[in-house]
From Swiss-Prot:
Localisation per UniProt entry: Cytoplasm
Organism in which the protein naturally occurs: Cronobacter sakazakii (strain ATCC BAA-894)
PROSITE patterns linked to this entry: PEPT_TRNA_HYDROL_1, PEPT_TRNA_HYDROL_2
Record's keyword terms, sorted: Cytoplasm, Hydrolase, RNA-binding, tRNA-binding
Protein name per the record: Peptidyl-tRNA hydrolase
Active site: H21
SUPFAM superfamilies: Peptidyl-tRNA hydrolase-like
Catalytic activity: an N-acyl-L-alpha-aminoacyl-tRNA + H2O = an N-acyl-L-amino acid + a tRNA + H(+)
Cellular component aspect of the GO annotation: cytoplasm
InterPro entries, alphabetized: Pept_tRNA_hydro, Pept_tRNA_hydro_CS, Pept_tRNA_hydro_sf
Role description: Hydrolyzes ribosome-free peptidyl-tRNAs (with 1 or more amino acids incorporated), which drop off the ribosome during protein synthesis, or as a result of ribosome stalling. Catalyzes the release of premature peptidyl moieties from peptidyl-tRNA molecules trapped in stalled 50S ribosomal subunits, and thus maintains levels of free tRNAs and 50S ribosomes.
Amino acid sequence: MTIKLIVGLANPGAEYAATRHNAGAWYVDLLADRFRAPLKEEAKFFGYTSRINVNGNDVRLLVPTTFMNLSGKAVAAMATFYRIAPDEILVAHDELDLPPGVAKFKLGGGHGGHNGLKDIISKLGNNPNFHRLRLGIGHPGDKNKVVGFVLGKPPVSEQKLIDEAVDEAARCTEIWLQDGLTKATNRLHSFKAQ
């Protein structure tokens, strides 16, 4: 089992680029940079796309240009076109239930109130069985403050922790594609940025 599509969830536009909700896109941007495979807008996939080769694995990258709650439109378009199954997809997203500096891989599960995940599950025919990369952003402590929190920019100290976790997640994604998910998971899940 390998990954054929890696998606970084985000809201489009400069005003959202540095917000916590765009952490998934930061990770895909880093992978694209690392493999010198610049993302280019592709209208038929409703997003920015690229293609990388990791140890012989052909992997597509996608950052949807839809708003977050319509992310599934882009993911389903690309998965259908390239005949990519849900369990061959890795979706990177911001995670309120993990602190900044922590990232975890996960297969399947619910959407935890995340509108991007909710739409992807729906557009994949109510199939939640895709891989996720949960990038910790922390929680504001009050559920009524969540919207403002995810659409806000983290302070410099938190941004540094998130960036380090994104960097480690990118390394662990390469390990996954070379040596398998177990090895990658063991490494990523023992990481915590200081």
